Amino acid sequence: MSSYTAAPFKFPRSLRIIKSADYGVLVHTRNENTFRLTSKYFSINAMKFPEEPGRLRFGITVGKRNAHRSVDRALVKRTLREAARKQAPNLAALLGEQGVGLDVSLRLRVPLKEIPGIDQGVNALKLSLRTDARSLMEALLKRLPKQLAQTRGE
């Protein structure tokens, strides 16, 4: 019998943006309920939903223009999913307290070949991506209370 404990490391369907239309609304809408964050390699588009308290969903996209090989796109998506999964409990708690929902789109914004470490092997690349993804998610967690206060007009 195996003691496989994958459950804590899942990225459940309830945390994912599934529909293409939801991505379109998230990326193309600009109003007081949306905001953007960028880091060296990644960007976030986020939209607040005051009518759906506590809802948190992530969408992850990596275009062929920035990562030509599917192996590389999968690596970047895995890195972003892991960063999102680790911050999800903190974000969900904050959203629950504030009584709003949030959709977050994460994407690679620079070509993979421009990232330092690409020529030093996959481990150096993973480290660069992981560090930047973690710092971006921490920046989101830090900025979110300010954004929520603006929505309420405080």
Label each region the model flagged:
Residues 1-154:
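Positively charged, solvent-exposed patches that mediate nucleic-acid binding
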